[in-house]
Amino acid sequence: MSTIARKKGVGAVLWDYLTTVDHKKIAHLYLISGGFFFLLGGLEALFIRIQLAKPNNDFLVGGLYNEVLTMHGTTMIFLAAMPLVFAFMNAVVPLQIGARDVAFPFLNALGFWMFFFGGLFLNCSWFLGGAPDAGWTSYASLSLDSKAHHGIDFYTLGLQISGFGTIMGAINFLVTIINMRAPGMTFMRMPMFTWATFVTSALILFAFPPLTVGLIFMMMDRLFGGNFFNPAAGGNTIIWEHLFWVFGHPEVYILVLPAFGIFSEIFATFSRKRLFGYSSMVFATVLIAFLGFMVWAHHMFTVGMGPIANAIFAVATMTIAVPTGVKIFNWLFTMWGGSIKFTTPMHYAVAFIPSFVMGGVTGVMLASAAADYQYHDSYFVVAHFHYVIVGGVVFALLAGTHYWWPKMFGRMLNETLGKITFWLFFIGFHLTFFIQHFLGLTGMPRRVFTYLPHQGWETGNLISTIGAFFIAAATVILLINIVVTTAKGEKVPGDAWGDGRTLEWAIASPPPVYNFAQTPLVRGLDAFWLEKMEGKKELTPAEPLGDIHMPNSSFLPFVIAFGLFVAAFGFTYHNDAGWGLPVAILGLLITLGSMFLRSVIDDHGFHIHKEEVLEL
């Protein structure tokens, strides 16, 4: 049986994506879902900025403002940035290491559907009484008091389901990169984006379990009468802060390290030279990940840990600036002496350096424990983390979208529209967040929904809101670009930019279902570039052409995740309604039954015969 033939019709395409285990199509699913949640989180941000545009505004007040604020942060971190990072990991990493798929294709699909249904469950709260309203960190002191509706319960269960999917993805990429690299691809010949994915997956493996434990504790307290965080019964709300931030700070690097990997690929490609200091970049990536687990309590300087603990975490936090600085200078030296081509991805890459450095500088300021008593819970902190997350991660996601779009879809996004998007986004970003440093320094606290006239915050907030509309305009133009490209964009060859250095650019755009007809032989770093420099148009094969084994599609990942989605509703309402417990049991039976079917039914996949490959 073969699935090489393109399927026609909306129904066939929909079924294909619902049942796919192909890493490239799963990348499309992550990209579409993450893009949707990015738009949703952006809309929530726009509502926040409209409310704060003038004093005593009543556009979005009180509890509703708290819900929108909470969902903005939660959506952007867990449901937009994370899946978009996973989209590029899925689309690119197997191609960069010369593999035909990931190690566990079924688990890859299950990971996506777990994320999707977790995010869907979380957003159902909007229509079922109210969304989470305790901030994206959902501190226990606020969450346990939020009993007016089930918003926090949607938060705890939705993030658990989504988090399980993320952990599955991390395990999958660790095994894939360790076991499935093409012959000759040693660890020190891997592209930087693959290195970033490898280290990030290890981070996820250790960072997400503490969050999962915290969410289980929170769920037990709220739904089953537990007292983990209830001081009146001997619990401690500070435990939640430690559990959350042991996850929360590594989460920054879970997002930023893949961004660094994307920029490393872009700088090398469009400077038309090898990445400067490759070995030091690898070690800096590993060191950042290691130090990332030693700094979580800098979020808690004002909690009362004492001067010794504060000093230790302050020094550890400042230390992370060293390997990050190594990366910044290596990118600059990569451009130095290069023949730079200023494409849309390169615009984002160059703009990232000053933007991210500004976020890093304010990070070192916040790392001073004594000074943090002034900065804490002010708009200075809001400005800082947006300079890091938007200036680092979102710039990288936009750069990666333009850079790998032709590889994923076979068509080039319009460069003129791309550069208009960039300039609007760049100007809007700095307009929105630069002024917020000064709002914070003049005393504006974060999370407030209004302020009085004559406090000196009117002008800054108005400028910030105007900047947000620039970002919105940039997003609209990006969507127009995608629609126009899909309708009539120019088709591209395998090496879409003409300067590709890594293996993904050596095959067709978009790649065939099997990726590589023959597993390539890797003879050095920047393997495709080496072949081109020797005048070869194709990679050197490491094996003769033969039949290719591929996994079958399966509907079970969708059903397993859907079962947990159903069960989550039952657990949420089991104290309020008689149907709660039966629905929870039904959902678990759907999930466990599907897992049983997966265990007992033999599925050996199928083969694509070499004659079919030759025809293509």
Curated annotation (Swiss-Prot):
<keyword id="KW-0812">Transmembrane</keyword>
<feature type="transmembrane region" description="Helical">
    <location>
        <begin position="28"/>
        <end position="48"/>
    </location>
</feature>
<keyword id="KW-0249">Electron transport</keyword>
<feature type="binding site" description="axial binding residue">
    <location>
        <position position="72"/>
    </location>
    <ligand>
        <name>Fe(II)-heme a</name>
    </ligand>
</feature>
<keyword id="KW-1003">Cell membrane</keyword>
<feature type="binding site">
    <location>
        <position position="298"/>
    </location>
    <ligand>
        <name>Cu cation</name>
    </ligand>
</feature>
<feature type="binding site" description="axial binding residue">
    <location>
        <position position="386"/>
    </location>
    <ligand>
        <name>Fe(II)-heme a</name>
    </ligand>
</feature>
<feature type="binding site" description="axial binding residue">
    <location>
        <position position="384"/>
    </location>
    <ligand>
        <name>heme a3</name>
    </ligand>
</feature>
<feature type="transmembrane region" description="Helical">
    <location>
        <begin position="243"/>
        <end position="263"/>
    </location>
</feature>
<keyword id="KW-0813">Transport</keyword>
<feature type="binding site">
    <location>
        <position position="299"/>
    </location>
    <ligand>
        <name>Cu cation</name>
    </ligand>
</feature>
<dbReference type="GO" id="GO:0015990">
    <property type="term" value="P:electron transport coupled proton transport"/>
</dbReference>
<feature type="transmembrane region" description="Helical">
    <location>
        <begin position="158"/>
        <end position="178"/>
    </location>
</feature>
<feature type="transmembrane region" description="Helical">
    <location>
        <begin position="553"/>
        <end position="573"/>
    </location>
</feature>
<keyword id="KW-0679">Respiratory chain</keyword>
<feature type="transmembrane region" description="Helical">
    <location>
        <begin position="380"/>
        <end position="400"/>
    </location>
</feature>
<feature type="transmembrane region" description="Helical">
    <location>
        <begin position="275"/>
        <end position="295"/>
    </location>
</feature>
<feature type="transmembrane region" description="Helical">
    <location>
        <begin position="75"/>
        <end position="95"/>
    </location>
</feature>
<feature type="transmembrane region" description="Helical">
    <location>
        <begin position="349"/>
        <end position="369"/>
    </location>
</feature>
<dbReference type="InterPro" id="IPR023615">
    <property type="entry name" value="Cyt_c_Oxase_su1_BS"/>
</dbReference>
<dbReference type="InterPro" id="IPR036927">
    <property type="entry name" value="Cyt_c_oxase-like_su1_sf"/>
</dbReference>
<feature type="transmembrane region" description="Helical">
    <location>
        <begin position="303"/>
        <end position="323"/>
    </location>
</feature>
<dbReference type="GO" id="GO:0005886">
    <property type="term" value="C:plasma membrane"/>
</dbReference>
<feature type="transmembrane region" description="Helical">
    <location>
        <begin position="577"/>
        <end position="597"/>
    </location>
</feature>
<comment type="pathway">
    <text>Energy metabolism; oxidative phosphorylation.</text>
</comment>
<dbReference type="GO" id="GO:0004129">
    <property type="term" value="F:cytochrome-c oxidase activity"/>
</dbReference>
<comment type="similarity">
    <text>Belongs to the heme-copper respiratory oxidase family.</text>
</comment>
<dbReference type="GO" id="GO:0022904">
    <property type="term" value="P:respiratory electron transport chain"/>
</dbReference>
<feature type="transmembrane region" description="Helical">
    <location>
        <begin position="420"/>
        <end position="440"/>
    </location>
</feature>
<dbReference type="GO" id="GO:0006119">
    <property type="term" value="P:oxidative phosphorylation"/>
</dbReference>
<dbReference type="InterPro" id="IPR014241">
    <property type="entry name" value="Cyt_c_oxidase_su1_bac"/>
</dbReference>
<dbReference type="InterPro" id="IPR023616">
    <property type="entry name" value="Cyt_c_oxase-like_su1_dom"/>
</dbReference>
<keyword id="KW-0408">Iron</keyword>
<keyword id="KW-1278">Translocase</keyword>
<feature type="binding site" description="axial binding residue">
    <location>
        <position position="384"/>
    </location>
    <ligand>
        <name>Fe(II)-heme o</name>
    </ligand>
</feature>
<keyword id="KW-0472">Membrane</keyword>
<feature type="transmembrane region" description="Helical">
    <location>
        <begin position="102"/>
        <end position="122"/>
    </location>
</feature>
<keyword id="KW-1133">Transmembrane helix</keyword>
<dbReference type="GO" id="GO:0020037">
    <property type="term" value="F:heme binding"/>
</dbReference>
<dbReference type="GO" id="GO:0046872">
    <property type="term" value="F:metal ion binding"/>
</dbReference>
<dbReference type="Pfam" id="PF00115">
    <property type="entry name" value="COX1"/>
</dbReference>
<protein>
    <recommendedName>
        <fullName>Cytochrome c oxidase subunit 1</fullName>
        <ecNumber>7.1.1.9</ecNumber>
    </recommendedName>
</protein>
